[in-house]
Amino acid sequence: MGSERTEMRKRQMAATQETPGTAQAQHSVGNRGPNACCFCWCCCCSCSCLTVRNQEEERARRTSHELQAEGIPNCEESPAPTLEEVNAWAQSFDKLMLTPAGRNAFREFLRTEFSEENMLFWMACEELKQESNKSVIEEKARLIYEDYISILSPKEVSLDSRVREVINRNMLEPSQHTFDDAQLQIYTLMHRDSYPRFMNSAIYKDLLRSLSEKSIEA
């Protein structure tokens, strides 16, 4: 019995002597852990901050670009359409697109279908054709490309590969006619795809009914 008590006492003393060293070692390891994690976190944080900053700068550049770019207002200035004009819109897409009031009404409809960029692109091409200054033409052509042709743009219009190749060649030396093929393709797309739906839309029917009622009252 006495020998067993002596042995137990020795074990307790040995355990007591080991505890400070073990605790110190654990404390040291604990200190290294947070420092290492902090270092990693700082590196990751720096990378994330740089990424966010670059994205913000790009966003600001794009916003500035768009503000300077088209000069195309939310709607064109035009007198209110007459009943005769609105009836003429139903005769052909060309007659609709010839008048500012017709383009405004059609553009309002395209906005409901999230395809307003087609009209914006067409209008930008029309503006480009009116320019004669070489430097202005080059700048407008570049902006049109970035806004409506680039696959990175949220307002990219739908064009086939052949037309895109033509544009890329034309952009080597931009002119008023750089986007003629693309403009025709988008015009045809609006004519065949969006125009029939516009003629059956509430926007067109409400306008026609309103003008008809005013005509009767007069």
UniProtKB/Swiss-Prot annotation:
Gene3D superfamilies assigned: Regulator of G-protein Signalling 4, domain 2 (1.10.167.10)
Matching InterPro entries: RGS (IPR016137), RGS_sf (IPR036305), RGS_subdomain_2 (IPR044926)
Region (Disordered) residue spans: 1-26
The organism's place on the tree of life at top rank: Eukaryota
Gene Ontology CC annotations of this record: cytoplasm; membrane; nucleus
Biased composition (Polar residues): 14-26
PROSITE patterns for this protein: RGS
GO biological process, alphabetically ordered: negative regulation of signal transduction
Compositionally biased residues, Basic and acidic residues: 1-10
Modification after translation, per record: Fatty acylated. Heavily palmitoylated in the cysteine string motif. N- and O-glycosylated in synapsomal membranes.
UniProt membrane topology term: Lipid-anchor
Domain RGS residues, every copy: 92-208
Record's keyword terms, sorted: Cytoplasm, Glycoprotein, Lipoprotein, Membrane, Nucleus, Palmitate, Signal transduction inhibitor, Ubl conjugation
Compartments where located: Membrane; Nucleus; Cytoplasm
Pfam families referenced in this protein's UniProt entry, alphabetically: RGS (PF00615)
Keyword match Phosphoprotein: no
PANTHER family (UniProt xref): REGULATOR OF G PROTEIN SIGNALING, REGULATOR OF G-PROTEIN SIGNALING 20
Function: Inhibits signal transduction by increasing the GTPase activity of G protein alpha subunits thereby driving them into their inactive GDP-bound form. Binds selectively to G(z)-alpha and G(alpha)-i2 subunits, accelerates their GTPase activity and regulates their signaling activities. The G(z)-alpha activity is inhibited by the phosphorylation and palmitoylation of the G-protein. Negatively regulates mu-opioid receptor-mediated activation of the G-proteins.
Assembly mode: Forms a complex with G(alpha)z/i2 subunits and mu-opioid receptors; the formation of this complex results in mu-opioid receptor desensitization. Interacts with OPRM1.
Protein name: Regulator of G-protein signaling 20
Species the sequence originates in: Gallus gallus
